[in-house]
From Swiss-Prot:
This is Small ribosomal subunit protein uS4. It holds the Pfam family S4. One of its GO terms (biological process) is translation. One of its GO terms (molecular function) is structural constituent of ribosome. Component of the small ribosomal subunit. Part of the small subunit (SSU) processome, composed of more than 70 proteins and the RNA chaperone small nucleolar RNA (snoRNA) U3. One of its GO terms (cellular component) is cytosolic small ribosomal subunit. InterPro entries: Ribosomal_uS4, Ribosomal_uS4_CS, Ribosomal_uS4_euk/arc, Ribosomal_uS4_N, S4_RNA-bd, S4_RNA-bd_sf. The keyword Calcium does not apply. Component of the small ribosomal subunit. The ribosome is a large ribonucleoprotein complex responsible for the synthesis of proteins in the cell. Part of the small subunit (SSU) processome, first precursor of the small eukaryotic ribosomal subunit. During the assembly of the SSU processome in the nucleolus, many ribosome biogenesis factors, an RNA chaperone and ribosomal proteins associate with the nascent pre-rRNA and work in concert to generate RNA folding, modifications, rearrangements and cleavage as well as targeted degradation of pre-ribosomal RNA by the RNA exosome. The gene is rps-9. It comes from Caenorhabditis elegans.
Amino acid sequence: MARLKTVQSKVTKSPRRPFEKERLDQELKLIGTFGLKNKREVWRVKYTLAKVRKAARELLTLEDKDPKRLFEGNALLRRLVKIGVLDETKMKLDYVLGLKVEDFLERRLQTQVFKLGLAKSIHHARILIKQHHIRVRRQVVDVPSFIVRLDSQKHIDFSLQSPYGGGRPGRVKRRTLRKGDGAGGDDEE
């Protein structure tokens, strides 16, 4: 039986020039600052930013009172404000063109966990997320690149099943508790 062809949309775009020193240094700095796994994660965010800026540029070419510009422009601005990339005081399409990659990287769950002080470092935050220790509202999230909305930001916490969140203690703690219980039982007899 023939396999069905699956159509997948692009999520990254590799750079045109593979060995450009300034770009390589900039990407390496972003990877270190935000604790990313590889360059592909940087390229994914750059591609998202490029799509947003392209939409804003196309809308800016239309007239101010054009219904398409009003409707789609407001939708784009509301979406960017909702995820916290754009400030509410700057709700104009001109400000969308000034967005940087860092604005999007700041909204990742990994960065937010580190900024809230739940992790000791940005790399520790990634490990906590991948090991199912972090939840957003009631949902455990194990994707470090999860984009946190502004209204969900105050609901980031440790999972209820996690040892950090009051769940079952970890392996070492259970062993020390057992040793403590065993030693206490021998003294009484």
